[in-house]
């Protein structure tokens, strides 16, 4: 060995178990490991075989932390405190990875902030400001490895998300159908969502579905597969007609997604002659329903007969179009009950008006009649319920023949398609049209229940579109959880709250430094929810000590509101 050679030795515990003469022995040695001319050498410093297990573990622990023995402290020298919420963020993040959402978004800072907005939407609906405040209560920075941010960073991330929406949707589409191949049937429907304020760039007054009269709105289109899995979404100006949104969806399927075989399923009024022509240009097909007026015309022309309508499906082909007919007895009874309910309401109003006329001799009977007539017209029963006067009284005369004529198509519906019988059976056509209920459920979840899209507080068009896209990505997570937890007696919202209640435990040393964060064993319900997802929480998570704070302060805003209120009283 060279006289100036440097030997670096590492001390370790050599703990071995071996069998000799049928007996199990344990040998524990305290040894040094070093290299001489490139070869590993060992020297034994002490034989610890006679030491107790506790003593051996203590020596191992000391060697493991020999560079910082101050961290080896007694139980009396530490204290614990509740840490950040871990369960919901951890599970949703893992689910986002499984569904390809994380991969589609990418690993940039904007991608991670976008992912947090998606997770936050499922955990607790709100604005970008509330999502920033949420990050102070949830271990989002530790789990997503995010640095400090404020609400302005989230708005910038929305701009980024809007610019990358098409790429992300394409990536998710590829991930979803990589193994089973692209589907043939696609469900499409639209809804509207009201806006707060008058300054949204896409906001217009149009056909309102939210019952918010006087408010501007946007129109939202959503396409799913036959199981209701969201594929893409698009936002239009609030006065856009439903049919005007279809052409863009056809272009997406033919261009961006590159699908060759498409059958678009849309409700009556969505797919009309223009849309059918657009679909035909791409060699695509359609499934839709026809209106009551169209049914009556086909009956008048002899194409259909009332006897065809039955509980069992009936199919008629005419001029290359297949018509699938059925009468739903439950729906028929519901319509009949509504009709009778309207007549009852009209009779109550008539009785009220007659009482007023009797108590007020100077009251004009014609005014009362017009009031009742307006009510019947509003309820659309004036064709068979005639409002007239007899002396100083108003009465309702029902025409049984006209009422029966209106009721003859109660519960009847007709689905039409240009698909050949070889491509899809009668039952398949009927089932795919009924699958539109999946899109309706998606809108209901996105707008009113779990995800609460309404009202929208952003102004710019690109951020409005990004907001809706975030909701769609969040619905993917909710969609998956609904199926994973289908046999657990709670809603997805309740399940998320249970997971969010799982918080880390911070272990603080005597010098006030955070040593580590452990995750406690969940309650029984939490265990069940985790088991259903096939996930388990880690024993601990890293602590990055990232400080997240809002630029806009609630206290400052409250003070401003108080000052404004005081000034308004002067």
Where in the sequence are the language-model features?
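Basic/aromatic DNA-contact patch characteristic of tyrosine site-specific recombinases
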Residues: 1-11, 58-66
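Anion-binding and metal-coordination hotspots
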Residues: 2, 9-15, 20-27, 32, ...
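DNA- and nucleic-acid-binding/regulatory domain cores of transcription factors and nucleic-acid enzymes
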Residues: 18, 24-25, 32-107
